């Protein structure tokens, strides 16, 4: 029986292998945990009808289709170091690993180029419904949230060119209208047993010879041979040749085998260090005030303003089916800090028009003695834009709006993430 429960969905990416060029698929090397309610990437098909054309009818009668792009969201409710490393590496653009015991520290920084690295993704829906691979995925936005009494969270908005590959195939076979079996042209049907092969045939329909409409055809068995032979119920009683359309999963390509998932413990916000007002000297964050139980939440936001478009294609490689242009229009980074208003510090920083650094570090469990999973964020130059006073329940609080700026020497940010993955 076909299994279409969302718990069986799988999502894989080329986390450690960026694409060499636009619309050039890479090898999938990591399966990622997936929120059960999330479809991380889907096609956004583009079409228009002819309602603005005079065509002799009141209502439109034609649809013009012109390709697709891709879009999706990838939220992680219990974020691990690997999720930060993957999303920030592709969101900011540069990641440099260095060995650290049996693990690695990944130093992630913004690139100057307006062309961010792309990765390949693939999605399995249910257990037997379909698999689809997407080329050239890009991180449009990232939001990382550290809120009281919760797990660290991270989510990304994704954009893609719309180039995709399915594990499905539609094949037309010409046979008699009263045929009892159909033989595929060359392919086997995927599956190691009879029940799986039968599930992997999604539909057979026949064109009625006399009237021209399509009718569904029953089928009961699929052979293990190459090409496969499918046993059907004869749709008619005459020998007249006609077309049968068969929608099925052929013997799968290598990309259809999803890679292993990396297992890490999630990060808990109770193990968060947050400093504001200090200075980064390139190796150490000096000074600053450590914020502790007063913090309700801290949220980091990255926006890349990714533009994915159809442009002229002299080679004709895209056939107008997917975009051939992806550019980052300008990076914006902000921090939202919600805290109890126990002091006048944020107000004074605004009065003084102060530029200063912010430092965060979320520490997880050890992966070896003395070495922990961690996510560390350094922002050398920040400014508090506003911090309106509010009443949160029965306490006075502040919602700080902080802009991350680009420092002349150290740039806008540096993330250092430790885990056991060799690179992103």
Task: Please report, for each region that a protein language model flagged, where it lies by residue.
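Signature of extracytoplasmic/envelope-associated structural regions
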Residues: 1-424
């Amino acid at each position: 029986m076909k299994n279409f429960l969302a718990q069986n969905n799988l999502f894989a990416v080329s986390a450690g292998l960026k694409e060499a060029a636009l619309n050039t698929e890479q090898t999938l090397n990591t399966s990622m945990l997936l929120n059960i309610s999330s479809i991380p990437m889907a096609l956004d098909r583009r079409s228009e009808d002819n309602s603005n054309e005079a065509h002799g009818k009141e209502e439109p009668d034609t649809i013009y289709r012109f390709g697709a792009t891709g879009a999706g969201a990838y939220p992680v409710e219990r974020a691990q170091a690997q999720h930060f490393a993957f999303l920030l590496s592709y969101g900011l653009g540069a990641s440099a690993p260095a060995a650290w015991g049996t693990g690695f520290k990944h130093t992630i920084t913004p690139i100057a180029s307006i062309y961010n690295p792309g990765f390949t993704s693939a999605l399995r829906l249910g257990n037997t419904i379909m698999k689809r691979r997407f080329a050239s995925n890009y991180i449009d936005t990232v939001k990382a949230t550290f809120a009281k009494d919760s797990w660290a969270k991270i989510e990304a908005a994704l954009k893609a060119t719309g180039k995709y590959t399915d594990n499905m195939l539609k094949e037309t076979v010409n046979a008699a209208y009263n045929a009892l079996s159909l033989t595929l042209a060359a392919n086997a049907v995927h599956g190691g047993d009879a029940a799986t092969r039968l599930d992997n045939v999604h539909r057979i329909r026949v064109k009625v010879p006399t009237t021209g409409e399509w009718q569904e055809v029953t089928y009961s068995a699929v052979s293990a041979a190459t090409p496969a032979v499918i046993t059907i119920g004869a749709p008619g009683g005459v020998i007249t040749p006609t077309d049968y359309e068969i929608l099925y999963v052929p013997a799968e390509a290598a990309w259809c085998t999803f890679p292993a998932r990396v297992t890490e413990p999630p990060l808990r916000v109770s193990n968060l260090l947050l400093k504001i007002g200090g200075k980064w000297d390139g190796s150490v964050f000096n000074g600053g005030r450590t914020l502790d139980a007063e913090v309700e939440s801290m949220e980091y936001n990255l926006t890349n303003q990714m533009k994915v478009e159809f442009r002229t294609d002299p080679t004709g490689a895209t056939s107008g089916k997917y975009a051939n242009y992806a550019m980052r229009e300008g990076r914006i980074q902000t921090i939202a800090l919600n805290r109890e208003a126990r002091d006048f510090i944020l107000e004074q920083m605004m009065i003084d028009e102060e530029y200063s650094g912010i430092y965060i570090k979320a520490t997880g469990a050890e992966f070896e003695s003395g070495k922990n999973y961690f996510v560390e964020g350094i922002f050398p130059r920040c400014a508090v834009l506003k911090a309106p006073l509010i009443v949160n329940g029965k306490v006075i609080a502040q919602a700080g709006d902080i802009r991350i700026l680009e420092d002349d020497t150290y740039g806008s940010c540096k993330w250092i993430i430790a885990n056991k993955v060799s690179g992103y």
